[in-house]
Regions:
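Contiguous alpha-helical segments
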Residues: 1-83, 88-106, 110-141
Length: 141
């Protein structure tokens, strides 16, 4: 049995899985937060999105639509994370696979966690958002 096959079998055992996970965790913790974020984006969104992320961050001047400052690198605080907003007609998997074609699909913009959740709650529906905004204005008197 070849060494790589033995290693693959060993990784399937509880001890092997635990050891490999610990090694991977140490590797990512030692990485620079910026590189860690870009590597995470590449794995989640595809190889064409990290460059888009850098360009979009610069185009938005490091700010969300709500003017909150965005964090470029990785952060352990979930509420501080910069979110990638995409058109709901395309899943993350479709965007990822499109990077291997001549016509890649890119996300829409970068948002703070709060704005990303808000858009999701309103199903990316501007009319619904306007109704609620108008309602809030009316409640203020």
């Amino acid at each position: 049995m070849a060494q790589t096959e033995r290693y693959k079998k060993w990784r399937q055992t509880p001890k092997g899985r635990e050891t490999r996970n610990a090694v991977q965790k140490r590797y990512f913790q030692r990485m620079d937060p910026t590189n860690r974020k870009l590597k995470h984006i590449q794995g989640k969104w595809g190889s064409h999105v990290p460059l888009w992320y850098i360009q979009r961050f610069e185009a938005q001047k490091g700010r969300c639509v709500c003017e909150k400052e965005l964090i470029f690198g990785a952060t352990d605080v979930k509420s501080d994370q910069t979110c990638i907003d995409h058109d709901p007609q395309f899943s993350r998997e479709q965007i990822k696979k499109s990077g291997k074609t001549n016509n890649p699909i890119y996300p829409r913009q970068l948002l703070c966690n709060m704005c990303n959740k808000g858009l999701g709650m309103f199903f990316d529906n501007p009319d619904l958002m306007r109704k609620h905004a108008d309602n809030l204005e009316n409640l203020k008197g």
